[in-house]
A protein has these predicted regions:
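Basic, amphipathic N-terminal segments that precede the first structured/catalytic domain
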Residues: 1-27
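Eukaryote-skewed repeat-based solenoidal scaffolds used as protein-protein interaction platforms
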Residues: 17-20, 30, 37-180
């Protein structure tokens, strides 16, 4: 899969964007913002297919979630991605993990030597979370060997690869706020 440069818009704003050329959809949001996609995907396919790229949903894999729920969320991400591809959409896989134990399955079904997306939001606010994120990132790089990593949020200096950074909504909001001063 080739990398397509685009401006990324959260799924929660997808229906309000008028000119969708050069834009893609991400799901780096609270799960409640996009769970409706799982229950009624055919309703959203026409809108989503009008975008240049769509990342797979970033269903939560919190470390305190039961393993069955984590695997179920991983499955839902893959099912939605495969369905959107069948509908002709250009899909970018979102890669996520919870802890070292999740490495046994969280990279299953992901493409190698292609474009992937990750988010560091919520992972850099404690030493333990930061270390777990970096351990998963290194594991992802070793196993998947991505050509590009679309990175949402703060990029830790230890992260390597061809990183394409997307500013998190809070950063864009802060920049807009500061520019009005």
């Amino acid at each position: 899969m080739e990398y397509r440069q685009c401006e990324w818009v959260g799924f929660n704003y997808a229906s309000s964007v008028k000119d969708r050329r050069g834009k893609g959809i991400h799901f780096f949001l609270e799960d409640y913002q996009f769970t409706r996609l799982w229950g009624n995907i055919d309703y959203y396919v026409p809108m989503l297919s009008s975008y240049d790229s769509i990342m797979t949903p970033d269903f939560s894999l919190y470390t305190d979630f039961p393993i069955a729920l984590q695997i179920y969320n991983h499955y839902r991400k893959h099912w939605i991605g495969a369905y959107l591809q069948q509908m002709g959409c250009h899909v970018v896989p979102t890669i996520c993990w919870s802890d070292r134990e999740s490495f046994r399955w969280c990279f299953d079904g992901e493409p190698t030597q292609g474009v992937v997306a990750v988010s560091s939001v919520g992972t850099q606010n404690s030493k333990k979370r930061r270390e777990m994120f970096l351990e998963g990132y290194i594991e992802m790089m070793d196993r998947l060997q991505p050509t590009h990593v679309i990175f949402y949020g703060t990029v830790p200096e230890e992260c390597r690869g061809d990183i394409v950074r997307i500013k998190a909504f809070s950063e864009r909001f802060h920049e807009a706020e500061v520019s009005q001063w």
